[in-house]
């Protein structure tokens, strides 16, 4: 059995070692994290307490908010703390945990977004059969499969990445532990297995992306036939934000297909923000900003009139 590692901790290089930049980074990340935390917790509370929102679309939205909380909580708090105390180290087990939780959350979220696109397709293109196709047991099964898929992907990649040897540099040129940067500093000569796993994962994620695009092509074709301008506006307001979130997550393709280097690259860190921090922050906003039901439920929650039935 190969020696797992000689390195006992990693150094997360982040965006900059400049003191002023570290303070700016910590403040910016803290604001983003608090926005994501507040928005997603509100979505979970509203969709749980308001019985009018106990429908498939809001059931999936609640699951998405849980995944978003996991996704941003894996990276942001540690990065903020490191910048504030000027200590960029992370333990080996901490790094393992970050890789596992990040991959499980992101992979599950992409599959869940695929399921949500099918939900919108069914609601708009086959409204008469919607209640039969998207019954509660089916929704629970599809959400469960998304979570299990994320866990399976995370187990494979985490095991593959940390079965490699790390006996040289322990400097990870990223603000969290991510696989491309870890592979760049590994001293193992045979990286074929992990690279193959990455390619398989990228192909699976790309398939999800293609399914989402095809689904929304059908949705938009159907929406154009709706005679009511209000109906068209409502359909677009639901579907377009969904596509925006998918595009943010799809930047992960660039991060994992781009050849990693041991030399620092600000581009890697910027790209990673797009798929680890922006989706959790923008999801609550874009899914509720033009959603009348969410606005009404939020108003009732503020007034203390929202109760679960």
UniProtKB/Swiss-Prot annotation:
MF annotations from Gene Ontology: G protein-coupled receptor activity; odorant binding; olfactory receptor activity
Subcellular location(s) per record: Cell membrane
Protein name: Olfactory receptor 14A16
Broad class of where this protein is predominantly found: membrane
Organism of this sequence: Homo sapiens
Family: Belongs to the G-protein coupled receptor 1 family.
GO cellular component terms given for this protein: plasma membrane
Disulphide-bridged cysteine pairs: 95-187
Residues carrying covalently attached carbohydrate according to the record: 3, 87
Keywords: Cell membrane, Disulfide bond, G-protein coupled receptor, Glycoprotein, Membrane, Olfaction, Receptor, Sensory transduction, Transducer, Transmembrane, Transmembrane helix
